[in-house]
Amino acid sequence: MLEAPPRNSEYLDDILCAIDKQYQLKFHYATPYGVEKDIMLSPAFVRLFKQRWYVIGVNENEQVRCLPFDRIAFMEVVCKRHPLSAKMKRLLTPDSFYDGCFGIMRMEDEQIENIRIRAFYPEYNLIEEVPLHESQQKVKESADGLYREYTLAVRPSRDFLQELLWHGRNIVVLKPESLKRQMIDILKDMMQSYETGECRNGEEDL
């Protein structure tokens, strides 16, 4: 039994055609905060992550945008060639744009970090069957087999932190210390949210 296809998957063929023919796409789009806007995009490639399709491209202001299909209310293919600039062509390939990334977010201010984690039995079997990231390498195993340690070269984006949290108490960050402290702070905020029922995600005043 397969999972249900991602929402608005019917746009995929038209978007791939626009990429191939270097056409632009016109979207009516809703942001995560409920703001609706019209966007003109020159698409470069698409990416599937956690049952959501995304189109990555350049808007009219030469800004890179990453738009999930499921927030598109209306889409039109503008059948007129509008090639990407040479600079954007070099940047906007999956390998170069997502170098060192996990998931869909590419934060300009997040540098690739050498991260060391510890995974406890039996969770380490899972992340060896389905690695967290292509750079994942096993570097240590305890004598009693209770844990294994791994290194990863990855940007610590929100997507990556959420993946670590998904594994719960079965994975802990060892290095760098800054990321370890960040994870501890997130867990403390989560605990306070559960205890008080109040928002602790940094967006309380929105």
Feature roles, as predicted:
Residues D38-M40, C66-F69, R116, E149-T151:
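Well-ordered beta-strand positions in beta-sheet-rich domains
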